[in-house]
């Protein structure tokens, strides 16, 4: 888990060799390797491998995000149903009040959460505590799949804040824009 020494460099590689450490230790399959490349402070390339699932997600400049070579896209705007789900942190029951009409799931890997939102399986995800190495690759993949990232408070989110502080300064929601707007009304920080 690290970034290059100079966060102001034109190119910065960001590596998390084991995202989802607790899942890995528990013998659960939801963990992965995450590699991102920032170009002038913006995610330009991302690769997330979920080895036990046989899934490799990636994004490169000017191309759609892919899962094992097949293009992926976030869930389209629509009405929510009871089987729809969002990803949440494992400690959400202590930190948030969530009034979501579908299901909530904790995957145990922030990288996997970005991937499931990017491929349209999850409507969105709430991410409350993360370092740059947890999100750099996922941001590139999510954005290439048509997704967005916004602060839970509604303030504009900028990855440069995470680069400077090495961690999120407030929770974020990821997904398609209309889903994020609805989720923000249904998730309250305690």
Question: What are these regions, as identified by a protein language model?
Answer:
Residues 22-24, 43, 56, 65:
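Hydrophobic "anchor" residues
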Residues 21, 50, 59, 117, ...:
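Residue-level signal for inorganic ion chemistry
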Residues 40, 68-69:
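Short strand-turn-strand beta-turns centered on an Asx-Gly dipeptide
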Residues 1-39:
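Flexible, acidic active-site loops/lids enriched in D/E/S/T/G that coordinate Mg2+ and/or position polar
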Residues 115-190:
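Oxyanion/phosphate-interacting regions
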Residues 33-37, 46-48, 56-57:
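Short beta-strand scaffold segments in enzyme catalytic cores
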Residues 73-144:
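Phosphate/pyrophosphate- and phosphate-bearing ligand-binding catalytic cores of soluble enzymes
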Residues 35, 63-67:
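Short polybasic amphipathic segments
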């Amino acid at each position: 888990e690290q970034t290059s020494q100079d966060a102001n460099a034109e190119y910065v590689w960001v590596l998390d060799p084991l995202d989802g450490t607790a899942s890995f230790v528990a013998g659960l399959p939801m963990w992965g390797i995450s590699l991102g490349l920032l170009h002038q402070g913006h995610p330009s390339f991302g690769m997330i491998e979920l080895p036990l699932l046989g899934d490799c997600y990636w994004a490169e400049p000017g191309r759609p995000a892919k899962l094992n070579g097949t293009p992926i896209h976030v869930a389209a705007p629509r009405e929510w149903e009871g089987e729809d789900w969002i990803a949440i942190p494992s400690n959400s029951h202590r930190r948030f009040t969530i009034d979501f009409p579908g299901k909530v799931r904790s995957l145990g890997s922030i990288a996997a959460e970005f991937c499931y939102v990017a491929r349209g399986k999850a409507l969105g995800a709430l991410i409350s505590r993360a370092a740059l190495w947890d999100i750099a690759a996922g941001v590139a993949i999510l954005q290439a799949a048509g997704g967005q990232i916004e602060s839970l408070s509604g303030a504009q989110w900028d990855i440069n804040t995470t680069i400077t502080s090495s961690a999120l300064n407030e929770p974020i929601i990821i997904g398609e824009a209309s889903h994020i707007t609805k989720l923000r009304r249904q998730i309250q920080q305690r």
